[in-house]
Amino acid sequence: MRVDLFDFELPEAAIALRPASPRDASRLLVVRPGDPLADRGVRDLPALLSPGDALVFNDTRVIPARLSGIRHRAGGSGQRCEAMLHLREAPDRWRAFARPAKRLAPGDRIRFGSEGASEVCALSGLDATVEERGEGGEILLRFDLSGPALDEAIAGLGALPLPPYIAGKRPTDAQDTTDYQTVYAREPGAVAAPTAGLHFSDALLAGIDAAGIERVHVTLHVGAGTFLPVKADDTDAHRMHAEIGILDAATAARLNAVRARGNRVVAVGTTALRLLESAADPDGTIRPFSGATDIFITPGYRFRAVDALVTNFHLPRSTLFMLVSAFAGLDTMRAAYAHAIQSGYRFYSYGDASLLFPEGAPVSESIT
């Protein structure tokens, strides 16, 4: 499909630079194809679902994946550089997006720290070798540290990887370390937050439990590729970067039981949805999954594992807007986004939320 079909005018002021406070005070737009749009609040979610439905949360935890350092090369002067980690390939190896990538070559050494200051790195020992340089600024780094020691060094020297549409407008601060993490995050490894989950407070989770709605956790370590723009003119020419996901056998059995009794599986966020769809058979049976997925969902895709989706408002021409357009229909989503913009909904990672039902959902699934 042509990428420009997913373009729309988004006022810059609509991009939220801070989340709602408290986090469950966000607005919620309910979108069901064929029904009028409904302006609600995230706190209404327990009343909008049915007892026995299951909300599927991505419990990945964001790590401070943005590293600054100095490139060292024999016979040359140092060059400042930045690496945004996005995919761990081994205990001592990460794929990263580098700036300026053109100044890096295989064999280069990088010392990471406070702009590469040696006194900082003497404490952390965080040095790396560039093993590969790929397309789009991607490099493969082999660190001198490995496993938990590397994790500890990254935690001490890295910075929170706020999306560029936020980080370009204001500096990251201490509040972001709380705001840009879900309250249920427990599996370190993401370099971007599963942002639909940012709306859920402990109080809202208690309300979900009280309403008889199941809470299920899966893990997809969100990569920095989620920030990348689609540069191709056609969706067929775009390739997603792989992300690592885990869905165990007990979780698969729980979710299959939910649907077998006639209830719905509701994904909290596009990351949870992408993992569920990656784990599902053509007949909708969810299987255990552990590994990489690069699933790219565009209109025409037949959804197998997800009956509803909680998600934020996404940017024009993004793979995420393509996904929600595949789920609820392109015309439906264009109309919903036009309403959201006109009504002052806040967009992107720190913005408001929507509850989407798929095209062709039976009338019995309608909500009030």
UniProtKB/Swiss-Prot annotation:
The keyword S-adenosyl-L-methionine applies. It is an enzyme of class 2 (transferase). Keywords: Cytoplasm, Queuosine biosynthesis, S-adenosyl-L-methionine, Transferase. Its main location: cytoplasm. It catalyses: 7-aminomethyl-7-carbaguanosine(34) in tRNA + S-adenosyl-L-methionine = epoxyqueuosine(34) in tRNA + adenine + L-methionine + 2 H(+). Monomer. NCBIfam families: PRK00147.1, queA. This is S-adenosylmethionine:tRNA ribosyltransferase-isomerase.
